[in-house]
Design a protein with these regions (language model features):
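Residue-identity detector for glycine
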Residues: 4, 15-17, 373
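Bacterial N-terminal signal peptides that target proteins for export
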Residues: 1-12
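Noncatalytic, solvent-exposed loop/strand surfaces
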Residues: 22-459
Length: 459
């Protein structure tokens, strides 16, 4: 078993003692993967629609310059999303790797108009678009992050980029050019901890990297033997008013890292799996993780020092997800995988209910579910197949849970002690891949497909 003792601290920052808050810069903004500290929960008071689709509560639809599964983020009146083009867009013909480009796109949230776009040549060679890895997600899988003044994007081997909100490039830096053992590509998204940009560059460097967010200077580099098999995104755990930990899941363990220095503060033995696909979830003083491939689930009390396996585990269980991260709301944790919804008590991990997603009413704006969502795509396909239907994670706003599968079926659920499907919606009759987790901000929901960005609101 890999242990936290095999974490290797390589470069330490000096003079960066600070306390980090897990709160985002503006409450109504959605500035990172899954919104405020990765919880997937919007605290906005604006109403959100139950039913929507073509001709109903669809505010706008904007064409994107390429594919991707990264999620949109919302900063003030702007929406940011990353894409890729030129290579690996079609399974039938991957094309020439030399043509691979990355894109950062900034859109006006009012009407979907593109305000600016930046195109980046890929650092080559990339992992090939073949097999069961990269074709599942492509080359724009990392969700950007913003501090309200700048926007940061991680493009794997092509590096880390920082722009101001007007599109001026402020800095760029390498995060390594390695690959994971399976050459599946990378997808972990960057987060901000105060002035430190945290980049989980597992496949690229077998490391978590810390950069000064204003200058791009690398502050520290911390290696872990198992980070090459990590595809999840960290979150911040506020232990007290003097201490915040960066928490990330790794094969067999959960780690708590000092964001100022990259030093490992604590580790906890966890799921029995050699890869970590989902992201940790933090609620108050408890850290939750659910992993796929039979890895199981765990709840850990925040804080501690060194090996906390014998002292901080609140409960552990056998629940598993595939890729998506659970949603925790009012003491209940909702897991969605393979068309099944399972709800467990966050306090003890005991099951509350389990049920299969079915329509709560006629689908709006499209044909019935079950058609392909991007062609016959690996492990059961994107078209509602049992293997490939779940990629995005559930989010919550206006007291309702929103979940989209890869085929583009969008379920609206009522949280509670039993499964209640309020509606099933579709935004398009076309075959598009909806693998990205939605973003919620100020009464609007943003859904990203392989071709378009959609804005839904109660009109």
């Amino acid at each position: 078993m890999l242990t936290g003792r095999r974490w290797k601290q390589l470069v330490m920052a000096a003079g960066l003692g600070f306390v980090v808050s897990a709160a985002d810069s503006v409450a109504s903004d959605w500035v990172r993967f899954r919104g405020p500290n990765g919880t997937g929960i919007s605290t906005d008071s604006e109403p959100l629609p139950v039913e929507f689709g073509e001709g109903k509560n669809l505010k706008w639809k904007a064409a994107l310059p390429g594919a991707g599964v990264s999620c949109p983020i919302v900063v003030g009146d702007r929406v940011f999303v990353t894409c890729y083009s030129g290579y690996g867009v079609s399974r039938q013909d991957a094309g020439d790797m030399q043509s691979l480009k990355r894109h950062m796109v900034c859109l006006d949230r009012a009407d979907g108009k593109v305000l600016w776009e930046r195109t980046i040549d890929a650092v080559l060679p990339e992992d090939e678009y073949s097999g069961m890895g990269v074709p599942e997600h492509g080359y724009a899988s990392h969700t950007p992050v913003s501090d309200g003044e700048r926007v940061y994007a991680f493009f794997g081997k092509s590096g880390v980029y920082c722009w101001d909100l007007e599109g001026k490039e402020l800095w760029k830096a390498s995060a390594g050019t390695g690959s994971d053992d399976r050459a599946w590509g990378s997808s972990s998204s960057p987060i901000l901890a105060g002035q430190v940009l945290i980049v989980p560059a597992g496949p690229e460097s077998r490391a978590v990297l810390g950069y000064d967010s204003k200058s791009g200077k690398q502050l520290w580099k911390a290696e872990g033997d198992s980070l090459g098999n990590v595809w999840g995104t960290p979150a911040l755990s506020v232990v007290d008013d003097q201490r915040t930990d960066v928490v990330i899941g790794a094969p067999y363990e959960i780690w708590g890292i000092n964001p100022a220095t990259g030093k490992l503060r604590w580790y906890c033995s966890a799921m029995e799996t050699d890869q970590f696909n989902s992201s940790v979830l933090i609620d108050g003083g408890t850290i939750y993780a659910v992993e796929g491939r039979g890895g199981g689930s765990i709840a850990i009390r925040a804080g501690g020092k060194g090996d906390v396996s014998g002292s901080n585990v609140v409960w552990s269980g056998n629940d598993s997800n595939r890729f998506s991260t659970p949603l925790l709301y009012e003491g209940r944790m909702y897991l969605i995988s393979g068309g099944l919804v399972k709800c467990v008590n966050a306090a003890d991990g005991k099951e509350i209910f389990q049920g299969r997603l079915t329509a709560g009413g006629p689908a709006a704006g499209g044909p019935p579910a079950g058609g392909p969502g991007g062609g016959g795509r690996g492990r059961g396909g994107f078209g509602g197949g049992r293997g490939g239907s779940d990629y995005a994670s559930p989010v919550l706003g206006d007291g309702k849970i929103y979940y989209v599968n890869r085929a583009g079926d969008i379920y609206v659920l009522k949280p509670g002690a039993a499964l209640e499907v309020l509606a099933k919606n579709r935004l398009t009759a076309d075959q598009e891949d909806f693998s990205a987790t939605p973003a919620i901000s100020n009464g609007q929901i943003f859904f990203r497909s392989s071709r378009h960005l959609y804005c839904v609101s109660a009109q």
